Amino acid sequence: MVTSDKYYPYDRPPLSKEYLRGKIDRNSIFFEQPNYYTKRENIRIILNTSVEKINVKEKGVELSNGTIIHFDKALIATGGRPRKLKLPGEELEGIHYLRTLDDCDSLKQENGKEAVIIGGGFIGIEVASSLTMLGVKTTVIEVKPYIWNTFVDEKISRLIQNYFEKHGVNFILNEGVKEFIGDKRVSRVITEGGKTLNVDFALIAVGIVPNIEIAQKSGIEVDNGIIANEYLETSAKDIYVAGDVANIYDPSIGKRRRIEHWNNAEYTGKLAAKNMLGKREKYNFLSTIWSDIFDLHIESGGDTTDYDEYIIRGNFSVDNPNFNVIYLKGGVIKGYVAINRDYEELSALNKLIVSKVDVSNKKNELKDEKYDLSKLSL
């Protein structure tokens, strides 16, 4: 494994949550200690090194240190990098991105009491929760009309926003940032609408850009990521792709997409390994997305954007939210967004999405919390 990272593999989801809040220590972030890898003869990890080019015909990779490594099969799992805003003052001290362990360590060193987060997506909202719990007055600026707009619909977004506001988080919506101002260090954020916010530090969290450059330079097909077939093969023979950078046809929703979440990265990594070893197993996975913010556990599966009706199961309220919004199209469950629901219910819904069972005449059962949803797939 060749990586430009200086650390052995570690768990990224806690960076915006438990690790940022100091609930877990630095060692627990790592999947294994270094000797786990170094004592194994069949595992070699090259740190602090990038791949400059892949010679797809000769089956060789050229490293940044000039070394050439030949392969029988290769996997590209380059992920993504934080999207930059390229605004005046963005180079000032106190302006952060969050993607790596070092990014989080830098953010943890901030001791100011007022922060601005630009971006109301996953990372932005999770960090807003964490900073607020640490006693930092936090404002989220989102250019779209509502937060988490690629993940939930407006009614759920408004409920989550209200829940955050009850915990002290401020929001500026439908408005972007114009510039950052400060003398060496950021002290003010100016919005496009002319608002001025005094800040001690800021986080920019406006999504990621897939790292496709190595594929582009090597003549491998790209389009919003690196194009993969159902076996996770790229357009180049014996070269596979996995994780956030992979553009995959998702049979659960019937279209191609890149999935920027942990469980899909884990699944595609394992599937690519199987296929590189000759198993020939097709991609067949319903990716679920989850987040923990304040005392809410939010989970979603399937497609929550393409629907003709929805059913609410549970208590859809900002006071003690505990519900599941189930999205249907043509009588078939397409997806769901759930807050504080149990594993059995979500597992049953995942199976119903995959099996495409017609539940047109079972809407009362979907609403009834006492009804066991697993019976619908029998």
Protein language model annotation of sequence segments:
Residues 91-112, 181-190, 195-271:
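FAD-site-proximal beta/loop scaffold in flavoenzymes
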Residues 107, 359-378:
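Cysteine/selenocysteine-centered motifs that mediate thiol-based redox chemistry or coordinate metal-sulfur cofactors
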Residues 245-347:
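Mid-to-C-terminal Rossmann-like scaffold of FAD/NAD(P)H-dependent oxidoreductases
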